[in-house]
Amino acid sequence: LPAVIPSDWVVTPSTVTHVHVKIVGQQEFLLPTHREFEVKAAGQLPTGFDPGTLYPSRNHPRGLQMSVYAASDALGSIGLDWETVRRHVAIDQMSVYAGSAMGQLDGAGTGGMLKARYLGQRVSAKFCPLGFAEMPADFVNAYVLGSLGGTGASLGACASFLYNLRLGIEDIRQGRARVVFVGAAEAPVTPEIMEGYAAMGALA
């Protein structure tokens, strides 16, 4: 039963676990339905791979989990020992530029904030901040690098990575940073967002 019983409902208990509801007048109902979705393909992580299990993810949105995992993997693949780099570069000489053009739209971010109430759930105080588009940079900084240099994102759909790369290059050229971490992360494969992509004809 809803938390607030409509005024045109008459609710009578019938058993310990069941009630009888009599509705006076017309009533609208939302019923589940099914249809074949136009989009048949989308890039996803391999089945069974959950980056959130590899660090204390605390219900982080999927895109942020991917960011932390990818950043950690990248540091292990640069050909240099990261601790050696840290000993030679001050923490305020490291910059991070990474973002998500779509933002964090799954149930742990903005998506959860937008639909929690109509699903009868509570809106968490984490939904809004974790949905911000620059959060990949903030999370790489906080969870992986711990730097005190420039942190942020430049957004531009498919060109987001290139825009962030430009910011990193400028930091090095201007002497603001000696090490720059650049990237982008998107995790928009949710039913609502896929509807938008389908309408655009962006996916096959």
Where would I find each of the regions flagged by the language model?
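Conserved active-site "lid/cap" helical segment
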Residues: 1-98, 105
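Conserved catalytic cysteine-centered active-site region
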Residues: 23-65, 104-167, 198-204
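Non-transmembrane alpha-helical segments in soluble domains
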Residues: 72-75, 141, 169
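Secondary-structure boundary elements
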Residues: 76-84, 146-147, 170-180
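Beta-strand segments within the central parallel beta-sheet cores of soluble alpha/beta enzyme folds
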Residues: 85-96, 150-156, 180-185
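Acidic, glycine-rich active-site loops and adjacent beta-strand->loop/helix elements
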Residues: 100-103, 156-160, 184-189
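Acyl-CoA/ACP chain-elongation machinery
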Residues: 176-204
